[in-house]
Amino acid sequence: EQTIKRVTAAFDVLPLGDNVRKPKVGIVGEILVKYHPVANNNIVSYLEAEGAEVILPNMMDFFLYAAYDEQVKRRLLDGTLGNVIKSKLFMKFLDYYRKPLNIALQKSKRFSAYEPLSALIALAEKHLSTGNMAGEGWLLTAEMAKRHR
């Protein structure tokens, strides 16, 4: 927790060029394509070389999405109560470890805290059902809607 505070504080005091304005470009897609340079043809390096600030979704949302799908399966399909319980426990575990980082990011001058999964779900549900689970289903829609705001 202290390390998170120190790192966030250190980034907050790094000098920035006042005249440097970069267009922000969000990358969305399947998890492998978003994060693996070979799978995405080095898109991050290419965009940065072209002067863009690349915004990648945080990976934790993918794990929360996968866990939450067990709850959707129970509600809409034929999911098991055992998987729902495991899903909720796993999500609480992830949120517990993400909380100190979120607090530090909220206090930061330059960073934004992570949105709760419920906010991503609400964004997605404006366009489709969370029952869309193929690939990364509704999470892709939520990521696109988030970047569009």
Segments (PLM) and residue ranges:
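An N-terminal assembly and electron-transfer interface module characteristic of large anaerobic redox
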Residues: 1-149
